[in-house]
């Protein structure tokens, strides 16, 4: 495995840990943001391994899935699409109070749980060479 791939994996795990800290402190919008970043970086690890090059500077998770040539199970793909859509409104909310209501603690917990599940699957695929 390439050293830059290993770095992407470490960054993804660091970002998931940061999302967990944001959950504890009640910063739920940042849970979504950091969860998205964790998935983005793990997908970039896949792209790095497949292309043997530094991945494009993209935040689009669906693009990265395609670029990596991954056959993602449908429930994981559905979540990737969902968090991909949530990324911009949680990063740049037009109405902070509305965003805080929409992305409540329970929503943040669900996002972080699903992120951890998808990250685990992505890492397993990387380690197995699939």
Functional labels for PLM-detected ranges:
Residues 1-130:
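Terminal alpha-helical segments
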């Amino acid at each position: 495995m390439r050293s830059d791939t290993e770095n992407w994996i470490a960054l993804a795990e660091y970002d998931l840990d940061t999302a967990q800290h944001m959950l504890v402190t009640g910063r739920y919008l940042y849970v979504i943001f950091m969860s998205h970043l964790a998935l983005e970086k793990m997908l970039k690890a896949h792209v790095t391994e497949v292309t043997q090059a530094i991945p494009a500077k993209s935040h689009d998770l669906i693009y990265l899935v395609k670029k990596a040539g991954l056959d993602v199970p449908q429930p994981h793909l559905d979540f990737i699409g969902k968090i991909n859509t949530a990324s911009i409104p949680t990063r740049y909310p037009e109405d902070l109070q509305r965003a805080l209501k929409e992305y409540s603690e329970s929503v943040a917990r669900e996002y972080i749980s699903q992120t951890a599940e998808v990250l685990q699957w992505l890492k397993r695929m990387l380690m197995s060479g699939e």
